[in-house]
Amino acid sequence: MTEQASSSAAGAVRSRVDRTDIAAAVLIACFVALALHGVWGQDATSDERHYFGAGLEILRAHAWTGYGARLHPPLSYYVQSLPLVWLGESSPDDPVALFPCRATSLLVFGVPLLVVAFRWARELCGPAAALVALALIVFSPTVLAHAPLLTPDVPLAATGTLALYLFHRADHGAGRPWGWGLALGLCLLSKASAWLFAAALVIDAVVMAWRRRDRGILLRVAAGVLLSYAVLLVGYGFNGLLDTKGKTELIARVPDLPLARTAAHIASPFFPLPYLKGVATQLGVGWGGWESYLVGELSRNGWWYYFLVALAVKETIACLLLLAASLIAFRWRQAGREELLLLLPPLLFFVVFSLGRVQIGIRYVLPAFPMMFIFVSSLARLRERWTRVAIGLLLAAHAAAALRASPDFIAYFNELAGGSKNGYRWLADSNLDWGQNLTRVRAYARERGIAIEPDVLPSTGLVAVRANRLVGIGDPETYRVLRETYDPVDNVGYNWLIYDLARKRGSARRQ
C-alpha cells in the first residue's frame, strides 16, 4: 500500500512537472512570436545603426575603429553579426539583412534568458513560481521591445542572470567557480555596465564569507573573477593589451572626475585598449550628461526619480501591483542569501543610473528585470486560495496588456500615463521614439499628402512630427507652438504625432 502511494505521488509530481515544462515552452514560443512580430517591418533604431555589422568589422580588421564598436564590449556585436557572414556586407536599412540579425540576437540571448529565469525560480519556489517569473518576463513590454534589437541591453540581462544563477548553484561562492566565472566573463563582454553584476556577486560572496566565517569563499570567488577576466581578454583577442602609448594617450583624455584618472592608471596595464576606450567614452558621456526629457521638462543633469517614473509608466499596471505585493509580503528581517542575490542587481542598477546624467531610456535598468521578476514570483508560495486567484488574474491582465500593445512595444505606456497615445507627455528617446517607424510615417504621409517635420509650420493642413522633436530635444523652439496650442489628431506607432493646424486647442496649455 505504501509503495502504491509512493508510486502515485511520484507520478503526480512527474505529471505536474511535465505540465509545467509544456506551459513554459508555450510561453517561450509566445515570446519569440511577439518579439519578432514587434520588429517585423520596423526600421532600425538609432543605436542599431551604430552597431549593425560591428562584429563582422571587428573580426575582419581585428580593430575597434567604428564608433559603435568603441562604445561597448563586443559579445553582442559578434553574435548579432553572424547572419552577415552568409548574407555579406549590408545596410541596416535592408530588411533582408536586419531581420535575421535581430532574430539571431533574440534566439541566442532572449530565449536562454527565459530558460535561466524559469529554472532559477523553480529551484527557489517551485513550478508555480517558475511560471509566474516566466510570464512576467515574456509579457513585459520593455523586454519584448528590446529582446530582438541589435543592442547590448538584453545580452547583458541574459549573461548577467546566467552568471548569478550559476553562482547561486555554486552555493554563493562556496562551490567551484568555473561555471559562473565563465558566465561572468561573457557578462563583462556584453556591456560596460556589467560591472554592476560583478559587484552584486562580490558583495554577496563577502556577506556569505562573513556569515560562515569561511575565508575560502573569498579565494574561490577570486579564482572565478580571474577566470572572467581571462574570458574578457580572449573576447578582445588581447587587442591593445600591451599598447602603452595608446593607453597613455587615453588616460590624458579621461574626464577629470574624482579618482577617475587614478583608477585609469591602476587599471590600464591589465585591460585591452578597446575596452578602456569604451569605459572612457561611457564616463565622458555620463559626466557631460545627455539631454533628457521627463514630464514636460528637459535636463542634462537628470532627475533622481527618472527611472522610478519610467518603471511606473512603462511596465503594465498588473506587473506593478505584483511587484508592490511582493515587497509588502516579503519578510525583510528573515531575508536570506537567495533574496540578497536577487535584490542586489535591481538595487545597484536603479541607484547607480538614477545618480547618473544619462537618462534616456528604461533599457538602462532592463538587465536587472529578470532578478526583479524572480523575486516577485515568490508570491506563488502563498497558500491562500484567494492570493493564487489574484496572481492568476493579474498575470492574465499583464499578458493582455502586452497583446494589446503589439507590435508597438517600444512606445508602450500603461494606463497611469494615459496609454501609449499619451506617452510623449511623460518620456521620450528610447522609451518612445527611437527612429523605429520612419517607413510607416512616410507611407502615411504619402497617402494623405501631409508634411513631415517642416522647418516652418504652414498656416493650415496636417503635419507629422516625431515625439523627440515635439518635446524639444535638441531644439525646444521649432515646435513649441504645437506643444502649447494644439493636440494631436492621430499618431503613427505612437512616436509620430499628427497635427491639424486648423484645429487649435480651446485654450493654450503647456504640455
Question: Where does each model-flagged region fall?
Answer:
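Short acidic/glycine- and proline-prone juxtamembrane loop motifs at membrane-interface regions
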Residues: 45-46, 145-155
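Short helix- or helix-capping micro-motifs
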Residues: 133-138, 165, 184, 188, ...
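Membrane-interface transmembrane helices that cradle and orient dolichyl/undecaprenyl
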Residues: 163-177
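Transmembrane alpha-helix segments characteristic
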Residues: 26-28, 324, 334-354, 482-486
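Signature aromatic-anchored transmembrane alpha helix within multi-pass, membrane-resident enzymes
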Residues: 28, 221-230, 331, 335, ...
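Transmembrane-helix motifs of polytopic, lipid-linked glycan transferases
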Residues: 103-124, 162
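Hydrophobic, aromatic-rich transmembrane alpha-helices
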Residues: 310, 315-336, 388
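C-terminal luminal/periplasmic domains and tails of membrane-associated envelope-modifying transferases
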Residues: 1-9, 288-290, 295, 396, ...
